[in-house]
Amino acid sequence: MAEAAAPGTTVTTSGAGAAAAEAAETAEAVSPTPIPTVTAPSPRAGGGVGGSDGSDGSGGRGDSGAYDGSGACGGSDACDGSGDSSGDSWTKQVTCRYFKYGICKEGDNCRYSHDLSDRLCGVVCKYFQRGCCVYGDRCRCEHSKPLKQEEATATELTTKSSLAASSSLSSIVGPLVEMNTNEAESRNSNFATVVAGSEDWANAIEFVPGQPYCGRTVPSCTEAPLQGSVTKEESEEEQTAVETKKQLCPYAAVGQCRYGENCVYLHGDLCDMCGLQVLHPMDAAQRSQHIQACIEAHEKDMEFSFAVQRSKDKVCGICMEVVYEKANPNEHRFGILSNCNHTFCLKCIRKWRSAKEFESRIVKSCPQCRITSNFVIPSEYWVEEKEEKQKLIQKYKEAMSNKACKYFDEGRGSCPFGENCFYKHMYPDGRREEPQRQQVGTSSRNPGQQRNHFWEFFEEGANSNPFDDEEEAVTFELGEMLLML
């Protein structure tokens, strides 16, 4: 007879009990298999005693044996007496989620599967491809280089073609063998021709000395049209090609086009002035416009060359040095007098006209011919002709009119020259100064005293050199404008 067992202990059965257990197992095999459930073992220490099959009954954990809900070993075939429970039998079939990420701290004692084949997720590790994967063998992704797309495609096509060939050979036998033989011979002959032609690559036009390089022809759908009526798409493509031909090649216009005669764009005619292929062969307006622009540019270049030619040997009449041969490149400038054609460098003539040892009538006159000049115009080139000098003076005045007068100071100060000042008199809001009306009796009262007062004011400013910038220091002398009042 079976003895009643206390909870948490193992039941020992007799022969009749074993027969009853076998009958129960047979009934369970015939009945539908239920969904397996996991029953937590009893938390009591030493949950069972050793069974007849060698189980040590250390119990309490899932690795102590196969227990049912009452804590008794079912004595099934799964129990081998080594302490492996049915809970471990199904957990070992589940991959450990922490092992997938390489962070399982249980190691070999983990109840779940640590199979490498289950861990791989089928995705190649991008850090392994870069050579910087910190997980190493513990990484859950594959550490292998994937096949290239071309190789994979070729492998797939080869497999499909081999399968198709095997199936066709099994079904098609007879007259097709002779036909396939003829086709194979023709393919072999064509392949031999291609190989023979490829051996002659050393004689290509690219390697022949003295021959112009012509790039490969750009593939076009209209080069080999299908026989038959021309479709609408083909006509549109031909029209587009014609319109493209009307455009000049930008690479040929500035140098050399690598496509040469095979370029889809139009290569223009050579211009005699600039030496570039920029003249459209069919656009007369474009040709005339470009030629006119080249002529204007050529005239400017010639004027520049002539100006340098007549300026390079000019000697200053004060320091007796060639202006273009001075040690300081900033001193390669001329001080051109408005009413005189004598040559002076800008530094010397400014020093002469700012001297205080002589009267203003003497210092404002030419050191050689004593002709009084109202202006000293800085210039990088020597100008002697009257018309050219007038143009230079006009440009000089226009340049000065764009600079604000430091004496007017946007309305906060007072400029002694008034409307005769070359500099700009403008308020902060953008308004220009309106000329002031002279009061009756003020213009004729002792004008000499007023002139002397202004002269002393500007001579003091000239000596203090208020212009800090070198460019502004050589542009204009305010003291010279007294002669215009």
From Swiss-Prot:
Region (Makorin-type Cys-His): 271-298
GO molecular function: ubiquitin protein ligase activity; zinc ion binding
Domain of life: Eukaryota
Region spans: Disordered: 1-63
Zinc finger feature spans (C3H1-type): 90-117, 124-146, 243-270, 399-428
Pathway assigned in UniProt: Protein modification; protein ubiquitination
Pfam families in the cross-refs: MKRN1_C, zf-C3HC4, zf-CCCH, zf-CCCH_2, zf-CCCH_4
Cited PROSITE patterns: ZF_C3H1, ZF_RING_1, ZF_RING_2
InterPro entries: MKRN-like, MKRN1_C, Znf-CCCH_4, Znf_C3HC4_RING-type, Znf_CCCH, Znf_CCCH_sf, Znf_RING, Znf_RING/FYVE/PHD
Reactions that this protein is recorded to catalyse: S-ubiquitinyl-[E2 ubiquitin-conjugating enzyme]-L-cysteine + [acceptor protein]-L-lysine = [E2 ubiquitin-conjugating enzyme]-L-cysteine + N(6)-ubiquitinyl-[acceptor protein]-L-lysine
Main function: May act as a E3 ubiquitin ligase catalyzing the covalent attachment of ubiquitin moieties onto substrate proteins.
Entry protein name: Putative E3 ubiquitin-protein ligase makorin-4
Phylogenetic classification of the source organism: Eukaryota, Metazoa, Chordata, Craniata, Vertebrata
